[in-house]
Amino acid sequence: MSLRVYNTLSREKETFVPHKAGRVGMYVCGPTTYDYIHLGNARPLVVFDTIRRYLEHVGYEVVYIQNFTDIDDKIIHRAKEIGEDPIAMAARFVEEYYRDAKALNVRPATIHPKVSAHMAEIIAMIGVLVEKGHAYELGGDVYFSIPSFKDYGKLSGRSLEDLQAGARVDVNERKRHPMDFALWKGAKPGEPSWDSPWGKGRPGWHIECSAMSRKYLGDAFDIHGGGQDLIFPHHENEIAQSEACTGTSPMARYWLHNGFITVNQEKMSKSLGNFFTLREILKRFPGDVIRFYLLSTHYRSPIDFDDSKLEAAQKGLQRLRTSRRLIEEALAASGKEGAERPAGQREKLEEQWLAAKKGFREAMDDDFNTALALSMLFDLAREANTFLHGGFALTPEDRQLLLQVAETFEELAGVLGIDLAGGAAAADDNTVDGLMNLLIGIRAEARKKKDWATADRIRDGLKELGIVIEDTPQGARWKKA
């Protein structure tokens, strides 16, 4: 069976054929760095990390680009609220993102481009759109002319007549069309700005991803991913400006979108105030459990957040780890004592082992069905537990089969980014974070009481251990020197 993926652009499953045999170019929209990520933000991180892992597992070289939007209206607004420089605040939350991603065992992308480092590419792309008549300048702003792109709406299925209010639309009565969107925004006092042919300003939201994906993956690449909330207007506008600029269509061959995480059937979002930061959830559940929880549902299906489902994921992960441990213990034992094994038991385990490998591949080849893939691991674990129950003597053939089963557990779980060894490293990281937060709290209390000697002793002692405490208007934070 060949890999088939659901393509939002065609609204059907298609056989996956990359532009270049053996190589996949993938761009995924990353976070806007103005706050800690919430569970809804974490889902695409885990989903596309898993997709990348599987593509590499089956032999592809994957060039994975995930950006950081470090210039945006939300960043500027939040920075004003807390009295911090927007560029510095965005950089701080980039570092916090890396910590959260590590807790979920999300590997770094091949490249993590930042908007602030790609102004030349963004300005050049806007210039081409203006030259081709797809964009126009208006009092220091530059807008994309939606009617100039005849295929507008092909991703979301919306026509110009059907477009509704509620998207990120700039209100400007002078625009040629109400839905024309900003490529460049003229500078405002106190906001970050860059020089351009249209005066000082900063880029609009959509052009940023178009410029960065083009720089690192070219005019046409294989996979563009993100949450379903980005289909319109963000990804629709990306297609319009990219294809209008380059004349190449499609910009991305396959568009993949993960489903929402909901709370009481409403999308989890910062704007609705119904979100839980990943940091909050990590205080109750380890990162590997959260990852397991997110992969227990097909990536395109919604997940309604519920602690009981996280608890079920924790128990499920522990069952797999217990099975792995029992196999290890059996292989470590001499295996010479015990009654003779009932006839057909080894053959049954071997049959399940082969079925698990085949079923896992078929599940992942069917639009990355991680929920079904996990069920293959559970089926194998159940049969392995039955095989080991009863303390029967292990023949050399039994031991060889158990070794193969153990290797398959590790291999397939690894494809999903799940560590069956117990997540010791993640546990250690959580312990360190907890201890550091405790020490910072004690130091803050000492400073409040003007006990400078204790506060300085904590700071200096940590410095000797290679840990630096930084005091900021938002409180103390720590980092490795």
Curated annotation (Swiss-Prot):
Enzymatic reactions: tRNA(Cys) + L-cysteine + ATP = L-cysteinyl-tRNA(Cys) + AMP + diphosphate
GO biological process, one term: cysteinyl-tRNA aminoacylation
Note describing how the cofactor binds: Binds 1 zinc ion per subunit.
UniProt keyword annotation of Aminoacyl-tRNA synthetase present: yes
Location of this chain's protein in the cell: Cytoplasm
Entry's EC annotation: 6.1.1.16
Highest taxon of the lineage: Bacteria
SMART domains: DALR_2 (SM00840)
EC primary class: ligase
Disulphide linkage map: none
Sequence motif 'KMSKS' region, location on chain: 267-271
Keywords (A to Z) from UniProt: Aminoacyl-tRNA synthetase, ATP-binding, Cytoplasm, Ligase, Metal-binding, Nucleotide-binding, Protein biosynthesis, Zinc
Cofactor(s) in the UniProt record: Zn(2+)
A UniProt-annotated Pfam family: CysS_C
Motif ('HIGH' region): 31-41
GO MF term set: ATP binding; cysteine-tRNA ligase activity; zinc ion binding
Residues engaged in binding Zn(2+): 29, 209, 234, 238
PANTHER family named among the record's database cross-references: CYSTEINE--TRNA LIGASE, CYTOPLASMIC, CYSTEINYL-TRNA SYNTHETASE
Assembly information from the UniProt record: Monomer.
Stated family: Belongs to the class-I aminoacyl-tRNA synthetase family.
Protein name (database record): Cysteine--tRNA ligase
Species of the source: Heliobacterium modesticaldum (strain ATCC 51547 / Ice1)
